[in-house]
A protein has these predicted regions:
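Extended amphipathic ligand-handling, pore-lining, and cofactor/metal-binding catalytic surfaces
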Residues: 1-260
Length: 260
């Protein structure tokens, strides 16, 4: 008899507030959408798991979590990543899941990242436009993590969708890649921006994100935009806090495809 289960696999974070506001809402939405099925969470970062363990907080990898579900009698599992784009982290996660596929005789299914296609990008743009109403002479710098390769185009697709909807007050930046903070600052100055809000284009605003975006040092994004004459603040809410983001992840879990 087939028994289904579902796993939500995010990078994880050491910031307690971020786990509550950015990861928990997505996990709860998935658990509600698949009510009645065994549900578990996994953190893909070994570094995060190790440091949480030192605090007495238990967490498991995707492989460990899938193995546990199989041991409990789950024969068909859905693994929904909390990733934003199909970059290196996606490849590693897919490989980790693939290694457990034989444990699920009725199939192991893998959901897509948040920004997998144009529909996702448009829905993400709608969620951002609703969450951040426009203000006179004010811009919003959406800062993604950045990846190697073509996956970064997904970040640009969100901003393009915002611009197509008339929200030209949104600009894109990447922590690892281009445009970087200085390039974003120059663009905002050219556009006549007097003030700006930096908003993470990541599931969670973890400790390193907070340092790089909102830190007091001269190298942080907030400091660099302020140095360019733009009065800048930074919101530390990750994408996981937006209901529209949970909706995309739930849809992707429902559309998950079998690993072959």
């Amino acid at each position: 008899m087939m028994r289904e289960g579902i796993v939500f696999a995010s990078y994880g974070t050491l910031v307690d507030e971020a786990r509550r506001t950015d990861i928990a809402p997505v996990a709860e939405a998935l658990a509600d959408a698949f009510a009645g099925l065994p549900f578990a969470e996994a953190y893909t970062s070994a570094w995060v798991r190790e440091h949480l363990a030192k605090r007495g907080i238990a967490s498991t990898s995707l492989g460990e979590t899938l193995a546990s579900l199989a041991d409990e009698g789950v024969t068909r599992a859905i693994a929904q990543p909390g990733l934003i784009v199909c970059g290196d982290a996606w490849d590693k996660l897919a490989a980790e899941a693939q290694a457990l596929a034989e444990r699920f005789p009725d199939g192991l299914l893998l959901g897509r990242p948040l920004l997998a296609d144009e529909q996702d990008q448009e829905e993400m743009a709608e969620a951002l436009a609703e969450a951040f109403p426009g203000r006179t002479s004010h811009s919003f710098a959406r800062v993604g993590h950045g990846t190697k390769g073509v996956a970064d185009a997904a970040y640009a697709g969100v901003v393009e969708a915002l611009h197509a909807a008339g929200r030209t007050d949104f600009a894109l930046g990447l922590m690892e890649g281009t445009p970087d903070a200085d390039e974003v600052a120059k663009k905002l100055v050219r556009n006549g921006t007097h003030s700006a809000t930096i908003v993470p284009l990541m599931l969670t605003a973890g400790s390193h994100v907070r340092r790089q975006l909102a830190g007091e040092g001269a190298a942080s994004w907030t400091s660099r935009l302020n140095a360019a004459g733009i009065a800048t603040d930074c919101t530390l809410a990750g994408l996981g806090s937006l209901p529209g983001v949970s909706a995309i992840f739930v849809r992707h879990a429902r559309e998950a495809e079998a690993i072959r």
